Amino acid sequence: MALLASDVPLAPGTTGRAPEALLEPAELAEQRLLAAVAALPPDDAAEPYNEAQDGPWHQARLLLRLHRYAHEVVLGTSDPSLAGPGHALDLHRDAVEAAAAAAAAARTPRIAPATAYALGVLHADQRHEVEAARAVFRETWPYTAAMTAP
């Protein structure tokens, strides 16, 4: 006998279908996302080479994905207003990883100066892409009140 994903029991003692049973966790996921976005460093604190600020952005990306999945389960459809911010955070993650890889490669012992220079330029370019992705996220984030919360 085959079960559809919507028919799989969620936990022992859980009654009802998935959308009803997951309403409260979905609301919690949204609250966590809004809190994470509100905690992001402000624009004026942004520096292109500040890797210490990457962590909160990665956390916001993970929580956005969790919120999108919960939204799809509870409401049966994805929220199109979150596609742009989600894409921006994906680009952010890619640029952060590329910058870190370039920096690590540049620290290789006995690397040719020209190669080290090229990797440094690549690192700088990727850190600027990080800032560009953050700006796109801020522009496309549909809940502007969360961006200005203290």
Identify the residue ranges that each predicted region occupies.
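Cationic, histidine-enriched alpha-helical/coil surfaces that engage anionic ligands
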Residues: 1-150
